Swiss-Prot record:
Belongs to the triosephosphate isomerase family. GO terms for cellular component: cytoplasm. The gene is tpiA. Signal peptide: none annotated. It is found in: Cytoplasm. This is Triosephosphate isomerase. Homotetramer; dimer of dimers. GO terms for biological process: gluconeogenesis; glycolytic process. Involved in the gluconeogenesis. Catalyzes stereospecifically the conversion of dihydroxyacetone phosphate (DHAP) to D-glyceraldehyde-3-phosphate (G3P). Keywords: Cytoplasm, Gluconeogenesis, Glycolysis, Isomerase. It comes from Haloarcula marismortui (strain ATCC 43049 / DSM 3752 / JCM 8966 / VKM B-1809).
Length: 215
């Protein structure tokens, strides 16, 4: 089970969260990664935690002011990237171009989508993984696996029909170990979460609670 913690732009200490994630991953054997702001990738990667970018742009080296170059993210220590999060949506051509950019930089990729139909379309672009996140549940503490489990099973089925090799994750409202188990029972191979860890008073305790049912 893969746990990817998206720090978004929350006012947390990214190194503190990353250190906690690295320790919990080492202690539990569960794969835990952290996706910080682009400027913090290097500092987070130095903790030893698996580090992801929140986004890379569909560009190569050149005149692209304000873009996030995939190669720069990789050089800073990222090993993967999210794409098309509901808070940073992309046009289809830009998703495809960003996947190409990530491939050039040898970054693992997860394309986010809102529902099973979009998951099928995302899987057709051949990322390493897709993640279904209903935007109305993001940050609510109500997990999609409980609010509407058919979204998760539908996403798993939609991806499998198009690309049997793609991993399917779910997100939105994930915050407890019970949520993680529910996602796994519905066929997801991992979860995305953010506020449940990034806004926690004790990120390590939050992560320990999250992975405890897997031990």
């Amino acid at each position: 089970m893969f746990v990817l913690v998206n720090l978004k732009a929350y006012p947390c200490d990214p190194v503190e969260v990353a250190t906690a994630a690295a320790d919990v991953s080492d202690d539990s054997g569960v794969r835990v990664a952290v996706a910080p702001q682009a400027a913090q990738i290097s500092a987070v990667a130095e903790t030893g935690v698996e580090t992801w970018a929140q986004h890379v742009s569909a560009v190569e080296h050149g005149s692209h002011t304000g873009s996030t170059l995939a190669e720069a993210a990789a050089d800073a220590g990222a090993v993967g990237t999210l794409l098309n999060h509901s808070e940073n949506r992309l046009k289809l051509a830009d998703i495809d171009g960003a996947l190409d950019a990530a491939d050039r930089a040898d970054l693992e990729t997860i394309v986010c989508a809102n529902n099973p139909a979009q998951i099928g379309a995302a899987a057709a672009l051949d990322p390493d993984g897709v993640a279904v996140e209903p935007p109305e549940l993001i940050g609510t503490g109500t997990p999609v696996s409980k609010a509407d489990p058919d979204i998760v099973t539908g996403a798993v089925d939609a991806a499998a029909r198009v690309n049997g090799d793609v991993d399917v994750l779910c997100g939105a409202g994930i915050s407890t170990g019970e949520d993680l188990v529910s996602a796994s029972d519905l066929g997801a191979s991992g979860v995305l979460l953010a506020s449940g860890v990034a806004k926690a008073d004790d990120p390590r305790a939050a992560l320990e609670d999250l992975v405890e049912p897997l031990l």
